[in-house]
């Protein structure tokens, strides 16, 4: 899309192209001095979940499948804006899932890490709590074009409404 736009314009234009995650991570970099080192790597996330599962004595048939499913549920909770108290896990008892969710969040927080879902959650929180920062980004991006708008999730939609 960026190349097509540049070819049609035949000149440099002050237009930013990026995914939600790329744009929101850039915002968080400015606000919190994050770098790529602050993004939790897949192996860090899986190792964290292995430790939580062992600590909670959870049973499963296939470890990788179980962890993937739990991380998927954590992602669903973050992306939909559901309160953790109102979410019912498909993988384990609700009280256990809440512990897993909380411990996963604590691991990220203690290690100053964020996952891709946090990029959305933290940007939304930042904009809601800091009107000055929201205004600065509104001035930078006067217009937003979202490709495949029908595919965005709740938190992406909520952030767009803040603009």
Indicate residue ranges for each PLM-predicted region.
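Conserved P-loop NTPase-based nucleic-acid remodeling module centered on helicase motor cores
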Residues: 1-72
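A short secondary-structure junction motif
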Residues: 27-31, 77, 81, 126, ...
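Weak global preference for isoleucine
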Residues: 27, 39, 52-53, 67, ...
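Short, flexible active-site loop motifs that bind/organize anionic cofactors or intermediates
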Residues: 13, 35, 39, 60, ...
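Coupling/switch/interface segments within P-loop NTPase motor domains and analogous charged loops
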Residues: 42-114
């Amino acid at each position: 899309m960026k190349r097509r736009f540049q070819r049609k314009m035949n000149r440099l234009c002050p237009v930013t192209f990026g995914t939600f995650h790329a744009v929101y991570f850039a915002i968080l970099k400015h606000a919190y001095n994050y770098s790529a080192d602050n993004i939790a790597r897949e192996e860090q996330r899986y190792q964290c979940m292995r430790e939580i599962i062992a600590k909670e004595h959870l049973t499963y048939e296939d470890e990788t499948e179980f962890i993937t499913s739990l991380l998927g549920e954590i992602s669903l909770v973050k992306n939909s804006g559901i309160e953790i108290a109102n979410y019912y896990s498909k993988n384990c008892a609700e009280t256990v899932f809440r512990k897993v969710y909380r411990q996963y969040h604590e691991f990220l927080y203690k290690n100053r890490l964020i996952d891709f879902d946090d990029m959305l959650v933290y940007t939304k929180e930042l904009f809601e709590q800091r009107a000055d920062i929201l205004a600065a980004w509104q001035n930078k991006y006067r217009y937003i074009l979202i490709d495949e708008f029908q595919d965005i999730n709740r938190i992406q939609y909520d952030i767009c409404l803040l603009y």
